[in-house]
Amino acid sequence: MSEQNTIINSEEIKENEKIESETEEPITYLDLTGQPHTSIGDSYNIPETLLDLDLTNCKITKIENINHLKNLKKLCFRQNLIEKIENIDQLKELESLDLYDNKLQVIENIKDFQSLTYLDLSFNEIRIVENLSIKDIPKIKELYLANNKITKIENLQELVPIKNLELGSNRLREIENLENLVNIETLWLGRNKITEIKGINHLSHLRILSLQSNRLTEIGVKGLVGLNCLEELYLSHNGITDIDGLQSLKQLRTLDISANKIKTLVGLNELPDLDEIWCNDNLVDSMDNIEQQVTKSIKCLYFERNPVATHVQYRRMFINMFPQLKQLDATMVKRN
């Protein structure tokens, strides 16, 4: 089955409102991105053979006229004006549902989607995480709830299969209720109001953790213990003064502690796999401290806008100090 015969894009629809394949092959993908219309399927037919329907940025206000798409696997309503999740109960084969950037206030009608692995409800007006049951979405792997008005991590305990959880840009004050989500590999909690790293020690599969732009003042000796697979840690734009607590992260490759209030580096010499350190916009003033703490195999360093970076020989000293360094701040390292 050739892609040309099974895909209809928005440019074709503009010329021909009746959606038909030029061959006998069924249409499986319909892209109506950027074509404003008040009602789905009002002036055009939607082939029941569709596997993928993209209605991004169409000014749609209501989900309707798609329940006949029994084979649909991917449904995208990004950047519309939808206020309610409805009229999708017959889409039993759905694997991906994208409602990013709409007007949703409530999570509802996510019922009996036995194949759903991807759900994006980011950039809406949701206040409470609710109505997400493991019996309804038993295969869920990725859940995106960024940029809503959520104040509490709750009602996710059943969703054990989740590997990627995005709750950034909400109103969270505490990391909590993640005890059962032992399969999480990436956790995004940036741009909240979190003051303490806790409640994640059991996430032994976690590879990426983002807590940027919160209200942290320290990492804490026990906060990250148990995260033996962590490879990337993002802690920029907090009020951190003490980074003690990193020592157990033996797999860590990328550390972002930029834009904090850090004066002294601690524990980095115990992280053998560290490739990148972003420590710009801090208070580090000792070249000796950096030399003692940073592994000689480091490949990328950011220390601009620290007192130490005002040294007239700053760049030359760093290049000599770290023989494998490939990038210092925003500039690639050139060696003679």
UniProtKB/Swiss-Prot annotation:
One of its GO terms (cellular component) is nucleus. Regulatory subunit of protein phosphatase 1. Residues 306-336 form the LRRCT domain. Pfam families: LRR_8. Residues 1-24 are annotated as: Disordered. SMART domains: LRR_SD22, LRR_TYP, LRRcap. This is Protein phosphatase 1 regulatory subunit pprA. Belongs to the SDS22 family. The keyword tRNA processing does not apply.
